[in-house]
Amino acid sequence: MKCSYTVVFLLFYLLIASFHVDALSWAAWSPWSSCTKTCGGGVSRQLRRCLTSKCSGESVRFKVCAQKTCESKSRLARDTICGGEEIVSRGQCEVVCRSRLTGANFLWRVDDGTPCQAATSRAVCSKGSCQIVGCDGLISSSFRFDACGVCGGRGDTCDNGKFIWKVSEEYTACASNCDDIVDWSGAGRSIASTSQPIVVCVNAITGRVVPEKLCADKLRPKVEARPCPMLICPSRCRWMAADWTECVPHCGEGTRKREVYCVQTAHNVTVHVPDTFCENGTRPAAEENCVSTSCGRWEAGKWSKCTASCGQGVRRRHVACVGGSDCDEGGRPRQETTCYAGIPCSIATNSLDWNDRAYLDGNTFGSMDNHNDWQAPRLVAGEWSTCSSTCGTGVMSRTVECVAVNPISSAPIKLPMSECQDQEQPKLFESCEVRSCPLQEDSKLSEDEAPYQWRYGDWTQCSASCLGGKQKAALKCIQVSTGKSVQWSQCDARRRPPEKSRPCNQHPCPPFWLTSKYSDCSMSCGSGTARRSVKCAQTVSKTDGADAHIVLRDDRCHFKKPQETETCNVVACPATWVTAQWTECSRSCDSGERRRQVWCEIRDSRGKTQRRPDVECDANTKPQTVEVCSFGSCSRPELLSNRVFEQNAEQKKLTLGIGGVATLYQGTSIKIKCPAKKFDKKKIYWKKNGKKIKNDAHIKVSANGNLRVFHARMEDAGVYECFTDRLQGNVTLNFKYRDFPASRVDLAPKPQIPSTKNRQRVQVSKEDVLREQASVLHKMNVSLIEALLTAPNDEKAREQLRKYGNELVARWDIGHWSECRQKTCHVAGYQARGISCKVTFHGEIRNVDNSICESLASVRPPETRPCHREDCPRWEASQWSECSSQRCVSSMLAQKRRNVTCRFTNGTSVDIQHCDITNRPATTMDCPNQNCKAEWRTSDWGSCSSECGTGGVQLRLLSCVWISSGRPAGRNCEQMRRPHSARACVADEPLPPCMPTASALYQRDASCQDQSRFCDIIKLFHSCDSLEVRQKCCSTCTFVERKKF
């Protein structure tokens, strides 16, 4: 009955304790610890202590910190966590590694605070799993932003006036290397793009970022992008060739040329880059041979008759380009020439003013005394009449008169024809043809005899100013007699020549300034700036697209560069808040604060600013003036002392100070004091081997800042550091083993432990305890033995149990050590074994909970221990070779060598991947060597290229070599005088003269002659491909070409 009463009472006690309010069970939260990182995502921790035996909830909570992206680009923690070992699987927060030596797998957790990807929310890694981060910054928090941007709100406090757009100081990322370039069509982030400022919607009062929909009713600010540096990626560079020029010469075999560029295309813009970036590709030919089939030549017809019957006239002929349309205008034969009729024109017949009656009247002449003063009569022909036929052959006529001239008045006098009968009479009729008759197919007039002929006139303007255009010769119909242009209908359409054109302006286009459209204005008010791209470019192809132009350096354009910016939105702005730069952090390490000034300012239409009273700006949008800053943990001091402490085997508890090294027995309880003065000791924290210590039943930091370790184990060995606002000192603990004898129950009186505050003590009567104890000892009920040994410390109960003390024995049952397990080299392995607690009473042995042995003051043996440590392989380098015998690399400088291998301490060689490749010693090193001198070496002169005459040439080989070894020395002879590699033939006796050949006889009267004394080299190499060679060695090349056939 009393036993049942006891059980009911215990259950009632547990039920009452479970209803204690958490606020009374927990102490206040500690201050936040410093962030585990300074950038890239870390965590900060906060602790609270349970004041009662039963507390619900967590004793530690975490928040994210240092979320700013690190400036220096580093590899992801998931990629480096295995420390060079093989990565078997890579989770977001856990990575499985495999030892390259043993093949064993082991699990590593990613650092807490490392960002990870959750389904819908922001998340970070915590304790090996991806945990949601609440809007309050706490990991695993259930707080979220509501529709109004309030953290943990209910969506009923929206005020759109509180939310504004804000241009952050962060920009979108530029491509930092060629692997980041994801789109070469211009749509993605590519080579020389721009970086945009990030615009976010924020709560104007708190400054927190909120969903963008809360700023949907406000105009999003226009931002000004900044250009990204251009990346030149050799793997994406290519050769680009311009269009070919026309074949030169225009008839027969010749050459044509084109420009070849190394380019890189981005955003539909082709940029000219140095040729070295295209070395992996095949460079297109810049020159090639060609054959032009358009070989026009001039042909001239017969001269026409002289147009004058006396004095000087004109003769004309037809000149045409046949066999093509590219005849050289400079070599065009003359189409007109002067001619002489053979009879001087002493009288201007066109001015004769006839008056037959007056001058033939005898009375007129009769009055003159001297008839001898008259000139002798002569026949004078008049102008030809028009042709009797408008087309085809006709007749034209003229009159012939006998006249004389009075030498005094110079007036002509018409005489009877009989006065001139002794003179030869000129023709009175002549055949003529105005034009060919179109319907008269059987016309026998040649083209040269036609009165109207087709002629080519001046060239039209070139169709292009560069890169090769076309121009045409204007076709005209000319009246042969006058040389004037008439309508085309006057010329024979059947004889109309083909259209004639020629290439023109084949030179490259000059560089020019290529401009884009202006961007949007950088300011919505207050005089902003619009920008555009202005680049020096050159057109290299007539095709459209990115390959039509290449971008050059600005100094290649000789005209004034157009402006890249222009002023826009010249209107005044309303008053707004302006912030100054943040001050320096108040602390150089750990957490501090920094401040900045904030004032109200207006910007006028000209862009000038003026401070205004704060009341003119919106107080709800005023930026913060103070914020927290952190620059990582404070620097470490050196070890405070070199004290060495060795524990005495009789000691069970020890108190140590900071400094030195202590070697202790396992199982010892330790207290280490932190020498902090004038500091809040509740804020003291400890680290073991660089990792912050978390309180538990085995190890904890007390309220006064001291570190306590209960029943120390072998794995507790390490370096312990004490921190306030900086490192105060450290101590190194090592442990050694001791024997583990069986422990008997100590039933001696012990001082009563005072009860904890708010904890009730269960009262048990003497008779109940004796009855329960007798049942336990006789029936060996393990559960009741545990209840007896953990019962309240009642003096009367202990007196009743004292008589059984010698018969109740508790001891540890210890198993065998396992094989040594070692995850990786340079880290000690470990061995494990099983332990269990056994109680012996009246000869009977039972396995019981381990807590029974521990409660009997028996030291618990360690379940693990360190084992042999296998060192990592290391680099071993041999001695350097002698510099004097090594290969020369430049003048007075050689390169010595040595072997570098990866070996274990026992001398075993392994693959180099097992050693740290970043610390591999150099295998080569430059060293001074006086023997490293280069010189030109020549071979003997070769035989003469000619067996006769004086134009022969001798050749020899040149090579730059090291004097000491005779090996090739590359370009190390460039500063020395280069010996001649060719000379005119030198012989003891002059060579006999060459016999004339058919080729020589053929060229004897021609202008094709050799102009260089080295033309005989062509006979050795049979190379006349170059136009310059053919011009300077015309005779030799003719001989070579004839010899081929």
From Swiss-Prot:
Residue pairs linked by disulfide bridges in the UniProt entry: 35-65, 39-70, 50-55, 674-722
The cross-references to PROSITE patterns, in alphabetical order and at most eight, read: IG_LIKE, PLAC, TSP1
- Residue span, Ig-like C2-type domain: 637-732
Q: Which residues form the PLAC domain?
A: 1004-1041
Disruption effect? Disrupts the clustering of the cholinergic receptor subunits unc-29, unc-38 and acr-16 and the GABAergic receptor subunit unc-49 at postsynaptic domains of neuromuscular junctions (NMJs), and the receptors are redistributed to extrasynaptic areas. Loss of neuroligin receptor nlg-1 and netrin receptor unc-40 localization to NMJs. Isoform a and isoform c: Defects in AChR localization to cholinergic synapses. Decreased AChR-dependent currents triggered by motoneuron stimulation. Isoform b: Extensive dorsal muscle arm extension defects and weaker ventral muscle arm extension defects.
Identify the residues that the record assigns to the TSP type-1 domain, covering every copy: 24-71, 236-292, 294-510, 512-572, 576-635, 811-873, 932-990
Tissue localization of expression is: Isoform a: Expressed in the commissural GABAergic and cholinergic motor neurons in the first larval stage but only in the cholinergic motor neurons in later larval stages and in adult animals. At the L1 larval stage, mainly localized at the nerve ring and at the dorsal cord. Isoform b: Expressed in the commissural GABAergic and cholinergic motor neurons whose cell bodies reside in the ventral nerve cord and which extend axons into the ventral and dorsal nerve cord.
Signal peptide range equals 1-23
The GO terms this record gives for MF are:
signaling receptor binding
Major subcellular location class:
other
Residues of this chain annotated as glycosylated in UniProt: 268, 280, 730, 781, 899, 906
Print the keywords alphabetically.
Answer: Cell projection, Disulfide bond, Extracellular matrix, Glycoprotein, Immunoglobulin domain, Repeat, Secreted, Signal, Synapse
Presence of keyword Signal? yes
Checking Pfam families in the record gives: Ig_3 (PF13927), TSP1_ADAMTS (PF19030), TSP_1 (PF00090)
Where in the cell? Cell projection, Axon; Secreted; Synapse; Secreted, Extracellular space, Extracellular matrix
Gene Ontology CC terms: axon; extracellular space; synapse
InterPro entries for the chain: ADAMTS/ADAMTS-like, ADAMTS_ADAMTS-like, Ig-like_dom, Ig-like_dom_sf, Ig-like_fold, Ig_sub, Ig_sub2, PLAC
Task: Give a GO biological-process term.
Answer: dorsal/ventral axon guidance
Q: How does it assemble?
A: Interacts with eva-1 (via the SUEL-type lectin domain). Interacts with unc-5. Interacts with unc-40; the interaction is required for the localization of unc-40 to postsynaptic domains. Isoform a forms homodimers and heterodimers with isoform b. Isoform b forms homodimers and heterodimers with isoform a. Isoform b interacts with nlg-1 (via extracellular domain); the interaction is required for nlg-1 localization to postsynaptic domains. Isoform b interacts (via the Ig-like C2-type domain) with nrx-1 (via C-terminus).
Q: What is known of its domains?
A: The Ig-like C2-type domain is required for the attraction of the muscle arm extensions.
Q: What does this protein do?
A: Component of an extracellular matrix cue that is involved in the guidance of dorsoventral midline migrations and in the specification of postsynaptic domains at neuromuscular junctions (NMJs). Acts as a ligand for the netrin receptor unc-40 and the neuroligin receptor nlg-1. Secreted by the dorsal and ventral nerve cords to attract sensory axons and muscle membrane extensions called muscle arms. In parallel with unc-6 and slt-1, involved in the netrin receptor unc-40 dependent guidance of the AVM and PVM mechanosensory axons along the dorsal-ventral axis. Isoform a and isoform c: Promotes the clustering of acetylcholine receptors (AChR) at excitatory cholinergic synapses of NMJs via the netrin receptor unc-40.
Q: What is this protein called?
A: Protein madd-4
Encoding gene (name): madd-4
